[in-house]
Regions:
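The feature encodes the CheY-like receiver
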Residues: 68
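Acidic, metal-coordinating helix/loop segments flanking the phosphotransfer/catalytic sites
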Residues: 42-60
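Alpha4 helix (beta4-alpha4-beta5 surface) of REC/receiver domains from two-component response regulators
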Residues: 74, 95-111
């Protein structure tokens, strides 16, 4: 992943929640987003995310679809029921067919394929 901060101003003032089990990906995302001035909270799995304070409508949740245990699609379904709903960005290294199967029946969310581009991620915030 490109971890050098792009020359993009902070788009909003909420918290970014990262739900990612790979410490390397999670740390890289946190480094990039904090360098841009964002408040970032990392969660290594869905269970710890569910135990934390729920995100607000001004927040962004970046969730890995391939989480062990409770999967990323389950997290997205839970987030879709919130009002106000946070912005959701799904990340995955899975093939397109798996992505389609995981997200079938869910409202459209932004999906980024790993390896991630910092510029593309920031453009979705």
């Amino acid at each position: 992943m490109n971890v050098s901060p792009p020359d993009t101003p902070k788009a909003y003032y909420g918290t970014i929640h990262i739900v990612e089990d790979d410490p390397g990906v999670s740390d890289s995302l946190r480094f990039l987003l904090q360098a841009l001035g964002h408040d970032v909270v990392s969660h290594p799995d869905a269970e710890s995310f569910f135990e934390s304070a729920p995100p607000g409508g001004e927040d962004v949740v970046i969730v890995d679809l391939g989480l062990p245990g409770i999967g990323g699609a389950h997290v997205i379904r839970w987030l879709q029921q919130m009002n106000p709903r946070p912005r959701i960005i799904a990340i995955t290294g899975q093939p397109q067919k798996v992505i389609e199967d995981e997200l079938r029946g869910l409202p459209v969310v932004s999906v980024l394929r790993k390896p991630l581009s910092g510029d593309v991620l920031v453009s979705l915030l």
